[in-house]
């Protein structure tokens, strides 16, 4: 079983790194070729993406990291890896721990660091999450604007009622216009 381990732990102690490596290898062996799986372990999720050619990518994330984005990351990493090493023999001969056999050097995959850095903020890396974040921000602004308009409407009602300068006919016109405009409110 061959895999690329993608740890999302920023300050990994050696013992934690060792455990993450063991946990990743164990899970990579248990996911069937072409399958995907997520396993929960304490405060972390371990996402596993296995390709039909035997290449497996694993991401260790906290619970807040969106699973869909994690699997998008794993798919991108495996695609980039296969683009960099298209011949299976170039990576099938590499041992599980990333070191080469006595005849094969370890594979260098510098793109991995760039991809991991990009995916640290899922809202920036994933277009769907970015759109959702923009929609949420717009919704908050819209709610504030509507609340402000409604608040101004209440103040205007109060001013009209208190005004001695407006005739009874002007007050009736204002109330009638307001009731007719209310049928056209936003839903």
Feature locations, PLM:
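Acidic, low-complexity cytosolic segments
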Residues: 1-157, 161-164, 168-187
């Amino acid at each position: 079983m061959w895999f690329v381990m993608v740890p999302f732990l920023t300050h990994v102690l050696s013992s934690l790194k060792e455990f993450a490596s063991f946990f990743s290898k164990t899970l990579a062996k248990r996911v069937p070729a072409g399958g995907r799986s997520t396993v929960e372990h304490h405060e972390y999720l371990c996402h596993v993406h296995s390709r039909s050619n035997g290449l497996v990518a694993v991401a260790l994330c906290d619970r807040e990291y969106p699973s869909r984005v994690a699997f998008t990351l794993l798919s991108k990493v495996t695609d980039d890896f296969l683009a960099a090493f298209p011949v299976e023999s170039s990576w099938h001969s590499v041992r599980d721990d990333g070191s080469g056999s006595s005849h094969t050097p370890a594979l260098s995959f510098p793109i991995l660091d760039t991809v991991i850095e990009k995916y640290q903020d899922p809202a920036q890396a994933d277009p769907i999450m970015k759109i959702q974040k923009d929609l949420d921000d717009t919704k908050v602004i819209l709610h504030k604007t509507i609340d402000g308009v409604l608040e101004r409407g209440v103040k205007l009602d109060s001013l009209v009622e208190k005004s001695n300068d407006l005739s009874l006919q002007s007050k009736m016109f204002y109330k009638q216009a307001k009731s007719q405009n209310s049928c056209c409110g936003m839903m």
